């Protein structure tokens, strides 16, 4: 097996995603003194079908925007003279700056409680959760960026308890992706028994454990130990078996930050973002020094303050982050089966969310973005470390800019393709006097996508990134980015890509079958012969609640439901047992 230099190709991939076209607009002023405005033809027809009549509005001539070049895929062309009122977003002091920047860039207005009615907003995005009363009072045209009840997944002790319950209910074969875990202080006796039993079996060989505070994040309060006398804890902690054989790149430990968006729990709908972050420790992995956090912890909040952060490190280069696409390019350069790894990650995400999904209360018009932290060991097995609530969207480096700005863009596209499809939404907006409907349509655009489920995303996962980025551009239009591409090109062409990635990974990689062709983006071969797929779908069309979710929005790919059986098992209540059976079938197929 031999490697190849991925620096230039990887750099061109990263920069390719930044080459955008800024839309040009011209201003048309109607010449008639008494100008009459009619709703857009497509929208008016749908509102008439819903039994809502909108009288023509008369008034002063209104400047209108005529598009020369579309920044997004459009559901339909807007007629000249259509009134476009911007959507409104609401924030608090915790709202990430990149979210506000992206929304303003897309033409949204920021909510001003001094000048606007209390309900005159479309999206409320903040870091903290919402009270149930806030969920209950949300209007049909509004969206919240959190779902109630999801902290059961993001507290480390709760996650461990729920996954332990799922393992007990459905067997260990599916739930082998979490390290052996004990919740302190309740499991203290069990941990002590396990520790000394293992110590007796291993003899002089060391075993390693990691102790984490249940509620803290960003690597705070973490202790790694081998000797029991070093084990100290107070309050709520978890103790896990430390993965002592991580996949090393340039002898540095890394983990993956995978972004997952759940657009609804009833019915359950899960999307996985096919780009993400790879976070590196900034000092070389060394089990003989467990106190060196820069060698054992990959949290960027820790490593960006380390002495080696600015250095050009072997293979990794400058800083402590790669894009996920660069990481998979590195694996492919050594003939590692990255598609199989993606399947395992998708399955892990589904099984993890299934652990809490039945107990999550119903709430309309909300979504949840999770950050899954996953470690790959030297056998290419993915391990779930934790799930993060409100994953950090700060822009600390050029890699953050590349990933997180487009992530926010794609979340907005995803939510306004799926979140506003509920039956009667447009009619309700018009009835309540919300005049933001047209702007919602122009911002989120439309996506030429089938009305049915795309493919079995776990048994046939496509490569999201390959050497030809044009595939991505054909599938989804690239939206304008605020940061100038030339500025980022200068950053990305420097130290971040200074070194060749020609080093054998510290692993035993599974080779790709010679008979397995490399797949390109979105081979959406539907599994449903009983569903007639339409050639074009407008996000504004009133639809029934049994409609299959959109297969993709930007880099978000639907992973659940993944076939007709799981679609049915998630509609009228959540049939977890049936879903588990379908997942087990896929595992059996992959192993056969």
Swiss-Prot record:
The enzyme's E.C. designation: 6.-.-.-
Reported tissue expression: Testis.
Annotated Gene Ontology cellular component terms: ciliary basal body
Region of interest (Disordered), ranges: 1-23, 51-77
Entries under InterPro entries matching the protein: TTL/TTLL_fam (IPR004344)
Domain of life of the native organism: Eukaryota
All copies of domain TTL, residue ranges: 84-427
Residue sites binding Mg(2+) 1 per the record: 373, 386
Sorted UniProt keywords: ATP-binding, Ligase, Magnesium, Metal-binding, Nucleotide-binding
Residues at which L-glutamate binds: 279, 301, 321, 404
GO biological process assignments: microtubule cytoskeleton organization; protein modification process
Residues at which ATP binds: 212, 218-219, 240-243, 253-255, 298-299
Biased composition annotated in UniProt, kind: Polar residues: 7-23
Entry cofactors: Mg(2+)
Site (Essential for specifying initiation versus elongation step of the polyglutamylase activity): 218
PROSITE patterns xref list: TTL
Ligand binding (a protein): 218
GO MF annotation terms: ATP binding; metal ion binding; tubulin binding; tubulin-glutamic acid ligase activity
Name of the top EC class for this enzyme: ligase
Chain sites annotated for binding Mg(2+) 2: 386, 388
Ligase listed as a keyword: yes
Domain notes: Arg-218 is the main determinant for regioselectivity, which segregates between initiases and elongases in all tubulin--tyrosine ligase family. A glutamine residue at this position is found in elongases TTLL6, TTLL9, TTLL11, TTLL13, TTLL10 and favors glutamate-chain elongation, whereas an arginine residue is found in initiases TTLL2, TTLL4, TTLL5, TTLL3, TTLL8 and favors initiation.
Family of this protein: Belongs to the tubulin--tyrosine ligase family.
Purpose: Probable tubulin polyglutamylase that generates side chains of glutamate on the gamma-carboxyl group of specific glutamate residues within the C-terminal tail of target proteins. Similar to TTLL1, may acquire enzymatic activity only in complex with other proteins as it is most likely lacking domains important for autonomous activity. Probably involved in the side-chain initiation step of the polyglutamylation reaction rather than the elongation step.
Protein name, as recorded: Probable tubulin polyglutamylase TTLL2
Species whose genome carries this gene: Homo sapiens
Gene field: TTLL2
């Amino acid at each position: 097996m031999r490697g190849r230099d991925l620096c230039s190709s990887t750099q061109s991939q990263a920069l390719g995603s930044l080459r955008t076209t800024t839309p040009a607009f011209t201003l048309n002023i109607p010449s008639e003194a008494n100008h009459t405005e009619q709703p857009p033809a497509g929208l008016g027809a749908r509102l008439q079908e819903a039994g809502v009549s909108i009288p023509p509005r008369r008034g002063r001539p209104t400047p209108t925007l005529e598009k020369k070049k579309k920044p997004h895929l459009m559901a339909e062309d807007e007629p000249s003279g259509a009134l476009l009122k911007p959507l409104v977003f609401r924030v608090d002091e915790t709202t990430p700056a990149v979210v506000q920047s992206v929304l303003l860039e897309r033409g949204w207005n920021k909510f001003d409680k001094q000048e606007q009615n209390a309900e005159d907003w479309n999206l409320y995005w903040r870091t903290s959760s919402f009270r149930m009363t806030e969920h209950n009072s949300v209007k049909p045209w509004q969206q919240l960026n959190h779902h109630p009840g999801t902290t059961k997944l993001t507290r480390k002790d709760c996650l461990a308890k729920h996954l332990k319950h799922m393992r007990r209910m459905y067997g260990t074969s599916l739930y082998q992706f979490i390290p052996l875990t004990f919740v302190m202080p309740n499991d203290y006796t069990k941990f002590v028994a396990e520790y000394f039993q293992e110590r007796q079996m291993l003899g002089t060989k060391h075993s390693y454990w990691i102790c984490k505070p249940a509620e803290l994040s960003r690597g705070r309060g973490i202790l790694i130990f081998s000797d029991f006398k070093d084990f100290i804890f107070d309050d709520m902690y978890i103790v896990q078996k430390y993965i002592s054989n991580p996949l090393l790149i340039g002898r540095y430990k890394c983990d993956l930050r995978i972004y997952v968006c759940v657009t609804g729990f009833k019915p359950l709908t899960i999307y996985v973002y096919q780009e993400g972050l790879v976070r590196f420790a900034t000092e070389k992995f060394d089990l003989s020094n467990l106190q060196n956090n820069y060698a054992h912890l990959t949290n960027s909040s820790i490593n960006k303050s380390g002495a080696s952060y600015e250095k050009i490190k072997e293979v990794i280069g400058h800083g402590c982050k790669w894009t996920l696409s660069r990481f998979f390019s590195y694996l492919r350069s050594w003939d590692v089966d990255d598609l199989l790894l993606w399947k395992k990650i998708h399955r892990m995400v589904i099984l993890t969310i299934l652990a809490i999904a039945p107990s999550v209360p119903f709430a309309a018009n909300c979504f949840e973005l999770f950050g899954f932290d996953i470690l790959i060991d030297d056998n290419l097995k993915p391990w779930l470390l934790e799930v993060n609530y409100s994953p950090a969207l700060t822009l600390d480096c050029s890699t953050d800019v590349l990933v997180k700005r487009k992530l926010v863009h794609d979340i907005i596209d995803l939510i306004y393709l799926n979140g506003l499809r509920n039956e009667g939404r447009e009619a309700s907006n018009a009835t309540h006097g919300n005049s933001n409907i047209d702007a919602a349509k122009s911002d989120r655009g439309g996506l030429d996508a089938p009305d049915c489920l795309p493919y079995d995303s776990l048994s046939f996962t496509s490569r999201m990134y390959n050497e030809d980025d044009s595939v991505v551009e054909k599938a989804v239009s690239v939206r304008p980015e605020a940061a100038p591409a030339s500025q980022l090109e200068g950053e990305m062409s420097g130290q971040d890509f200074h070194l060749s990635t020609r080093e054998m990974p510290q692993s035993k990689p599974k080779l790709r079958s010679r008979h397995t062709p490399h797949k390109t983006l979105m081979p959406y071969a539907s599994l449903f012969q009983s569903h007639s797929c339409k050639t074009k779908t407008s996000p504004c069309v009133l639809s029934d609640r049994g409609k299959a979710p959109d297969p993709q929005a930007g880099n978000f790919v639907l992973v659940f439901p993944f076939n007709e059986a799981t679609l049915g098992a998630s509609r009228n209540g959540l049939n977890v047992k049936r879903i588990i059976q379908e997942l087990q079938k896929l595992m059996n197929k992959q192993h056969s």
